[in-house]
Amino acid sequence: CIETALLALLSDAELNQRFLPWLEQRRELLAEADPRFAEAAADLKVQLQAAADQFRACGGNLLPRFRALQQAGVLDLITCAATHGYLPLLRDTPEAVHAQLVTAVRQHQRLLGERPLGIWLPECAYYEGLDRLMARCGLRYSLLDGHGLLHALPRPRYGVYAPICSPAGVAFFGRDNESTLPVWSASQGYPGDGVYREFHRDLGWDLPEERLEEAGIRSRRPLGLKLHRVTAQ
């Protein structure tokens, strides 16, 4: 899924011009990390350099790469509601829901060359009748949380292991709850395992504020520089 907002960012010439300097700034800040984390910092520097090399190789524009993969049949790129609007909250204003869908479809086609066939509904949230608006925009399939299918009436014969078709002809795939658990669970999944990086700890919280200001960063915030592993806490 490539959301409409992300498409707009990826197509913005100024942001593309600022990306390589942004990567270089992060590499420079990594040089000031605590020496205890030198190995993690060095590994992250290599990753940032690889990202810079790839960005240069595609001419500073990622969209043609995505477009080529889609046209080759390697990817089936889908969209999302234009501003990630939570559609059940907008159901009393069908015009607003339609605007979310049609804007997303048009922007996807304009920037990627093809109309999307599928959509990732924000928060996998569905309400009765939404499928008619989706079909009107040419959207043929989407995905729901497992209970979105398991609590359907009638209950699907194969549960989440086969798509169901709505009255408007839109197919819905269910997300397997058991497969979701390892990804999201802090107690049983990847987020709680010590071999994975701690998402919430960031070099932006650890460097002196004066150094951040020298780099043009006016306030403490995450910089995308994660050097700590997950602990048992």
Each model region followed by its residue ranges:
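Short, solvent-exposed turn/loop segments enriched in Gly/Ser/Thr/Pro and often Arg
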Residues: 1-4, 81-83, 118-127
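Aromatic- and acidic-residue-enriched segments that line the glycan-binding/catalytic groove
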Residues: 6-27, 190-194
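Active-site cores of enzymes that catalyze phosphoryl transfer or operate on phosphate-rich substrates
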Residues: 24-91, 153-233
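Generic structural signal for well-ordered alpha-helices
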Residues: 63-67, 98-105, 131
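CE4/NodB-like, metal-dependent polysaccharide N-deacetylase domain
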Residues: 94-121, 233
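Hydrophobic, small-residue-rich alpha-helical packing segments that form membrane-like cores
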Residues: 110, 125, 130-140, 155-157, ...
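Short His-Asn-centered micro-motif
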Residues: 120-124, 144-146, 173-175
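His/Asp/Glu-enriched short active-site or ligand-binding loop at hydrolase and phosphoryl-transfer sites
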Residues: 140-152
